[in-house]
Amino acid sequence: MSAMNPLLSFLFNHPNPSQKFRDQVAQLAHSNYAILVPQISLDDHCDAELTPEAVFSHVIRISHTGENQRARYFASANGRTVIFKNDQVMTYRGYKNNVTVNIVDQYVYTPVCWYLPRTCFQNFLVYEISGYLTEKPLPEAPKEIDQNQYDGPSFEDILLIYPNVGRQLSRLLATTFDNYTSTAANTEELDLEFERATDRAIEYVQAIDPLMVRRIIEEQRLTETQLEKKIDEYVESQLSRKLWNALIALRTNEDGPLDQAVESIKYLSLNQVDLPENEKHWEAKVVAAANVLQTLANTSTNESLPCNCRFLENTLMKCIDTLTDDSIQVNADVLVSLLLVVVARANISHLNSTIYYIRSFSSNAVDSGKLGYMLSTLEAVMYHIGENREQLEAISEANRWFFERVEKGDLTEFDFERPSMKSGLQRDDADWKTVFAATNPAGESALMCAVSSNQQSSLTCLLDHFGYTQEDILADRSVQGSTLLVSALRTENEDIIKLVLDRVRDCADLAHYLSVGDEYGRSVGHYFFHSLYLQQQVGSLINWTARDNQGQTPLSSLCRSYDNPDYHALFKNALKTCLDATGMVDLRVHTDAKGNTLLHTVSDEKVLSTLLNHPDVLVNVNQPNKRGMTALMAHAKYARLKAIEVLCKDPRIDFAPTDNKGMNVFDIARDRRTADFLDECYMSLQPNLGETDKYCEILRSVIADGELCFVIKTRQDGKLSAVRRPYSDFVFLQKWLAHEQPLSWFPALMTPTNPFAIPHRPSREILHAMHLRLNLFLRTLLLHPTFSNHELLWEWLLVQDISHTHLAERTTKKLENKKEKDLEEYIILGEPEMDEIEGFVSHALQQVDLMRKATMNLHQASVKLCNAHRDYCKSWMLMKETVDELKEIPGTSPRENIIANLSSAMVTLGDTFRINNSSPFVFSCYIESLQNMADATTLALAHPLAQISHLRLQQMLLVKLQADAVALSEKKTFRDFFHDREKEIRLIKNRIHITENEIRRLSMETKNAQITLASELGGFYQVHEHELTLSIKNIVSRNIKRHKELQGDLEEIQRRFI
């Protein structure tokens, strides 16, 4: 099966590899390499050609060639160099282009390659990067430029683009700007001063090399007129503060009366400016436009704020655009009325001078176009204010008086004949009705103002004596869209809440009114935590699945109100009401925008227990949020011990999931008490090893004294102990156990990939893979018939401070004593005994070899399954990203709802797949451990066969030497050669003695090997069968669990679409 990633597929699934390519890949399989693979995307149109040279440029050797504090250098498989710096990879020596890409993901990949030995399953560290290292950047498509709209760079940018020009002009222009001081006696002279300054700047530009000026015009696609315009803008921006201050000083007499008039009509309302249509939908736009225009109010006093034409024009244009968006057609009369209220509420000074400044010093067309229309309209507004000042002041004063008393709660003795009510406002009811229907500068009606001011007396008086109908109450909205009842709920004043609720309770469409959201998207249901009685009265009318802007439903919002004294009563009643309304509570529906379920957010143990154990509440205990954290991880992160206790009592809890950073719950738990409790809960749930009450496992890693140490928890006789061991201690344990028992089969200790190979990006997945493989190593030792009760193993597991020297000396002495004891027994194997042992061992080897080959095939299949599952998860996330892109395409509301539901479905199913992503990898590691066990047993069984062959050779040599000794002793020789014959006889006898000792040793070792292997083969078969059954059972049970969760997710998705 080819890998989904094209680079991995080319490297390990090449359809027709050359011999050189195969040799290169084989070399990678026996060395420490990492692979940089480009991230997969559906629109992958990179022009990087997949050739062996390009592919091996993405394979780096982990051993770095050099380093400093900021970056590390790594050599590629074909001799090039890349730099790792923070989360980026940069090409260096050997690459044609300077390419910088980001690291987006990392994982361990085990290829199944047909042109590699079947026994070679090398684990590669894979870094997903945002692009190819060998690609040429695709040129950007040239944009079609409309010469009429193209503005080009500013003159200040031109000075930076052409430094030679900048150096020539900067000093001259700076001198001109610094020496400028206005001496104008009137505005006409001020205009002339500005023109002279602009002309002088243009002369400076014209004085430089004409060829350079022509080059600037051609390269920046400008005309001479456009260049002069940019010089004009540059001069104005540099002198703007001086020009502005001079203009304000010259126009003080003209601005003063108008500024006073604007300040006196601050409380003018939209319903009082003769709008031809309902003014309610204009209120929010007017408040927003006033906030925009308010930025001009500080221009005169704050020297740090800009006051150039570009800033002033942009501010005024933004104000107009806020009022006249594309969806609403606004004629001139309506715009003047709206701007009148905007100017009054913004309360800015020197507005006439602002208009004059733009008309006098702007380089844009100020008498035509949108800018001219805006200035003309503002002038019309200012003229209207000047002409109708007395009437507008009277209306504003009445509004101010009325709203001040509403805010102070002083409406009990309302009198129409107040001294402040000057001419312009009559006593008839029609005039005062406009005051009662007015809005304050914040856009609030009198009712809304009374509620937000928390004035019950004002609200009571308004409702009882001022003629407000139920329709007025239902239609009343704040600028942010809050209803009167929602605003009342925010005050947490029960009297005000009851007062408003009593006025709307009997309306025809109360459910719709209760579902209206405010600026946060929250309806009445989201504020139930304020009032238990309100929940009891209208809880059945609430949409319990409605979400606010944070994705919270009324139930999830209520569950977060921990500080409420009636928290448990609120939750109990809300759950009952929600169940009555919906029939079943599915916690997947009540997730917020960050993917947090109620199990993530609720920290109260009683509420959490109710959610987990209620028969009508559907809950996925292990559902992750968008950061990949399950509820158990979230509570472990914040050390919520009581919540963890409740979750750990649930049999559905899973400790295996990892978050988006690759951290599991044991990595996340930093608090000592929390970590110890999690360890205790996890270890208590694990089954015993064999028939004993023993179990051990590596739960986390720590850095101690600059070395990676593994925290090993051991359960024995109901007690839990912990030790920290570096990887070197595992090597020590393997070495000396095998040294003491050389005839036993021994599990292999694989050399791990360094998780800190790239220090800027340590790999949690590799670290957890190390945990798993070392756990399986210890598990095999504890199930081993010989080593399970070995004192060295248990001393290593239970005692933290051990002396390697002492243990090595003790093991060596034990082995020497055993050899001495064996030498005391005189055993010589004859041919029948050797045939018997050889037959037994050969048969066992044949059977174990068949099991080894079957296990190897199963391991290969499990690796394929693991890789396919990873690709499946990747493809699922790609599909989700593609669905998310559809959101950007405008469409009808039903279509947008379908896409939103589909995207949510993708997230739900993606979380289900991702959370079970570790299951195939764990299964593959289990099978790999069984294969290593079978390999070790095969090697152990092959040893006595080799010993028997050697023994037969030694026996044949002994017969030959004995025959030679007899022949020499019977041979007659001359007296002169007598000493030579005696010397040769002594040598042969010495060789006979050595051979007899070797035969004796081989016989003893072969016999011991037979006895040892005969006693261990049963244990091997039992352990192999038990572990294989357990691994299959685990992955099957996890898959069944996953499919049950998937079925629930699919039912929820079906409910959304139907």
UniProtKB/Swiss-Prot annotation:
CDD domains in the record: PX_domain
GO biological process terms on file: early endosome to late endosome transport
VPS9 domain: residues covered: 252-394
InterPro entries per record: Ankyrin_rpt (IPR002110), Ankyrin_rpt-contain_sf (IPR036770), PX_dom (IPR001683), PX_dom_sf (IPR036871), UPF0507/Ank_repeat_27 (IPR051248), VPS9 (IPR003123), VPS9_dom_sf (IPR037191)
GO molecular function: guanyl-nucleotide exchange factor activity; phosphatidylinositol binding; SNARE binding
Top-level lineage group: Eukaryota
One Gene Ontology CC term in the entry: transport vesicle
A family per Pfam: VPS9
SUPFAM superfamilies per record: Ankyrin repeat, PX domain, VPS9 domain
Cited Gene3D superfamilies: Ankyrin repeat-containing domain (1.25.40.20), Phox-like domain (3.30.1520.10), VPS9 domain (1.20.1050.80)
Family: Belongs to the UPF0507 family.
Protein name per Swiss-Prot or TrEMBL: UPF0507 protein YALI0E18612g
Annotated organism of origin: Yarrowia lipolytica (strain CLIB 122 / E 150)
